[in-house]
Swiss-Prot record:
The keyword Manganese applies. InterPro entries: PP2C, PPM-type-like_dom_sf, PPM-type_phosphatase-like_dom. Mn(2+) 2 binds at D117, D385, D436. The lineage of its organism: Eukaryota, Viridiplantae, Streptophyta, Embryophyta, Tracheophyta. Mn(2+) 1 binds at D117, G118. It comes from Arabidopsis thaliana (Mouse-ear cress). This is Probable protein phosphatase 2C 51. Its main location: membrane. Belongs to the PP2C family. SUPFAM superfamilies: PP2C-like. It comes from the Eukaryota. The keyword Membrane applies. Keywords: Hydrolase, Magnesium, Manganese, Membrane, Metal-binding, Protein phosphatase, Transmembrane, Transmembrane helix. It is an enzyme of class 3 (hydrolase).
Amino acid sequence: MTSSIKSSLLNLGLLIIFFVFFFLVINCRGESSTCLAVYKQGGAPAVFQSPKCPRWILQNWGSPTHSGAGRCHTAAIQGRRNYQEDRLLCALDLRIPFPGKTGTPKDVLVGIAAVFDGHNGAEASDMASKLLLDYFALHINFLLDATFSAMTRKLIGRFPTKGDHSVILHGVSRDEIMHLYNLDFQMQFRDSLPLHFDDSLPLDIMKEALLRAIHDIDVTFTKEASNRKLNSGSTATIALIADGQLMVASIGDSKALLCSEKFETLEEARATLVKLYRERRRNRGSSPSRFSDFKLEHGNGLLRFIAKELTKDHHPNREDEKIRVEAAGGYVTEWAGVPRVNGQLTVSRAIGDLTYRSYGVISAPEVMDWQPLVANDSFLVVSSDGIFEKLEVQEVCDLLWEVNNQTSSGAGVPSYCSISLADCLVNTAFEKGSMDNMAAVVVPLKSNLVTQLQRKEQSMNDNKDKIASALPCSNCTLPLPNDINLGPLQLKQAQPLGTMFNRLLRLKTEVFAAFICQRTLLGHLKGK
């Protein structure tokens, strides 16, 4: 083949590929320009209310009182209060599509566990628990939509050769993603997006989406509270689990903690057993920690759960919180032995609480950024503060150890612990005298990690098989949208969310399929 013919074929191939990608960019955008404009102006609240975004419809998510099914244990009880103001949420196995750095699709499994502790009414906690999933999904959708569009536009100007193994997404900047859809209406969150597409992209986008969701929940409730003259507020502690990693965003004094296995030496074990024995005597035998249930490993030491608190309480007497409150003109004083903003509000950060906003009470969450889960991390607990009126953080993990390692007869373990691990926590705290509402979510992590790894591997294999079968590269034809179906989003307890990503999955499939097609064509032409 002469060089002129080869050059002509190459130019023809490039021209064909250009039109393929032009078609994708024009016809495969996940959101209409009018809906994108609505999103730019008002975020999630505006999108769900606008007739310009007809496919976005709010679901009426309920807050379950208890569940021990599957890998998500939840429980909420009114306790000794006149009203139940606590709400909770647990949703596992959410499949979200992300672009991989090598050009292959990557579906990430996501779990959400959250507790909202309301005060001065349940309006704020109720709204937050119902809106979180919808708002989180919407923001992920728009951020991913911008990401895929930035990717396709970048691809139009860059066609790698057969030997080019650098990623097709290299060099797509944060600003390209944000400004493509003008997603900079919340400038304080822009820096959380990565400069390049790599393995951290899904985690960065999920963090960004969660922060935006929390912001928009507060915006929505602020408007509602202003219209209805509501005085209620709520804490919010939300944990995300994805790709074997964990992050937590927290407002107020609800807690998140990890219970992780730890081996103690004989000397350390001796001190632990003495402490547990004294605790049991002090509580007249009602302590959840029964030292006989801790395992001695080959006589060399003790295996037990160690608690790691993932959140910091936003109490007004915390030095940095107090400085902010006083700088805004508020003051911190104690009443009934509890520090309060202006002598009343017991938290310095909250969703709602409009009357305290001018005194330094804010709704911005404090974030524990993504950290890897390890093999000895056994349980994630997210709970309202009512449980910790009578249980220390370590006692919670001691109780979970006892229940998790009980004998087959279940001797010594209360009957309510057989319902769920969350029921075990809230009822133990109630029996020990807690006066508050109580809500808890307990996620067994070991089974969750194994499942995520298995599904991640299966997803990668499925994606490779489906793309390969859909692209007969001898003809190098672009598959129709229905030729590749990566399946609906899977979310335990929240199946209706699956429809939200259908168009996004289709766009993802077309973009990556087209890339494989053009890469094969170019390599074939240049190899001749």
